[in-house]
Every structure is written in structure tokens, then in C-alpha cells.
Design a protein with these regions (language model features):
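FIC/Doc superfamily catalytic core
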Residues: 1-174
Length: 176
């Protein structure tokens, strides 16, 4: 309970601080966050761009030498997904399978990854974990996840549940 109170207080402080930012300051802060999130998320997917190379790509559209086109596309897609979410702040207030699929399609655009819930088995490199392999069970797990998250009030609880459950379900062939 004490931790929950601290988190709620931190969230209120964050919102108050955000209100003091000008539009330009807000955009700059979101740009910085976008670079960090794009870089780290893409690293998890095996991308070899450095943080500095990612920043150059996202800000100046300058690709890094010795890197593949797919790595650049992956990073640019992460930026596009974050921009979409920032430009449509209410879009994910209530999660749905369709909205998750929409964000996934932005993340995987031009990467040769099929859209929609996967229809085949996947493995997680370096683990023995085997996610659900039936499209209907995956959809049901996603629907249950959306319902659970939509029923929560606390933004931190929602974020943690989203991260953990979507990672666990591995609903898409790639780009989870």
C-alpha cells in the first residue's frame, strides 16, 4: 500500500510537471524518450544500432554504415508507433485486440512480418518457453488481457500488466 501511494504521488507530480512544459519542450522531451525507447526496444529484437546511431537516424534520417536496411526500418517504425500514440492520446485508453494489432502493424511495417495474430508456433531464443501455438487460444488470451488491464485504474499497474502479459503471450510472429 505504501508503494502504491508513492507511485500515485510520483504520477501526480509527473503530470503537474508536464503541464508546465511548453509545446516545444514537450515535443523535445518526447523526442528524447522516443530515441531511448526505439533503441532499447529494437535492441531486444536483435538490432545492432548504437544509441548515438539511433539518435542520428531518428532525428536526421542518417543511416549507420554497416547496418542493414531492416535495422533502420525497425527503428523508424518504433518512432512512428510512438508518434501515433502521442498524436492520438486516447487511442489506447481502452485496450482491444484490434488496437494492439494496429500498433503491431506500425511496428512491423516493411519488415516482412505478417499482420495479425500468429498462426504458427514460435520459440523464444535462449529459453525453453513455448508460447501458446493456437490462434484461437492466443486471441482469447489477448481478449482476457485487454479486459484485465481495462479494469485497472492505476497507470503503473496497467503498464506492468501490459508489459508482462503481452511478452508472455507472444501474440505475433515477430515484433512483440
Amino acid at each position: 500500500l505504501e508503494e502504491k501511494i508513492r507511485l500515485e504521488s510520483a504520477h501526480k507530480e509527473f503530470l503537474a510537471n508536464m503541464e508546465t512544459l511548453s509545446d516545444l519542450e514537450y515535443r523535445k522531451e518526447m523526442e528524447r524518450l522516443g530515441v531511448d525507447l526505439s533503441w532499447k526496444s529494437s535492441q531486444i529484437e536483435g538490432n545492432t544500432y548504437s544509441l548515438l546511431e539511433t539518435e542520428r537516424l531518428l532525428k536526421e534520417k542518417q543511416t549507420a554504415q554497416g547496418k542493414t536496411k531492416e535495422e533502420a526500418v525497425m527503428l523508424l517504425n518504433h518512432k512512428d508507433a510512438l508518434d501515433f500514440i502521442l498524436d492520438n492520446p486516447d487511442y489506447l485508453k481502452e485496450l482491444s485486440v484490434r488496437r494492439l494489432e494496429d500498433i503491431h502493424s506500425i511496428l512491423t511495417k516493411e519488415l516482412g512480418v505478417g499482420n495479425g495474430i500468429r498462426k504458427r508456433r514460435v520459440g523464444i531464443t535462449g529459453t525453453n518457453y513455448r508460447p501458446l501455438d493456437n490462434e484461437f487460444q492466443i486471441r482469447e488470451a489477448l481478449e482476457d488481457t485487454c479486459q484485465l488491464i481495462n479494469g485497472k485504474e492505476n497507470v503503473f499497474e496497467k503498464a506492468l500488466l501490459t508489459l508482462v502479459l503481452l511478452s508472455y503471450i507472444q501474440a505475433f510472429t515477430d515484433g512483440n
